[in-house]
Amino acid sequence: MIGVGEEFPYFELQGVDCENNMGTVTLSDFAGWKVFYFYPKDFTFICPTEIAGMDMLVSEASVCGFSGDNEFCKLAWKKDNELIQDIKHSLVADCGLSLSEELDIVNKIEGVCYRATYIVDGGNVIQHVSVNALDTGRNANEVLRTLQALKAGGL
């Protein structure tokens, strides 16, 4: 698994932005601190609450969510689910799970990515990583606390 101190891998994938435009999303699109989070599938019941929670981080960092579902699925889900209709960050299609495979966060039995969160600095170096089981949601407030501590620096 790619971890703390390593560079986050470059990606060029399709996604849906906060205005529901579909297009190419790359690592270069994100400046400064970044929170990249991965979730198993669109149209599930845990994921919308996590996505809505992660949206509160957009004032602190660039935020982007990833799953293996395609961009058309993401757009349909955004339009269908009130919790994520108005999010202010992109959802990206890691079709084929190439990025998830490179990060080594794929559950081989289920064929989906784990619930992983990466906090990445302005130099694209991973400063924090956490990976949860498929059925265990994340706490966006804890991600925010970790992000703020990392941005503050020092011990």
Role assignments for model-derived ranges:
Residues 1-155:
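Chalcogenol-based redox active-site neighborhoods
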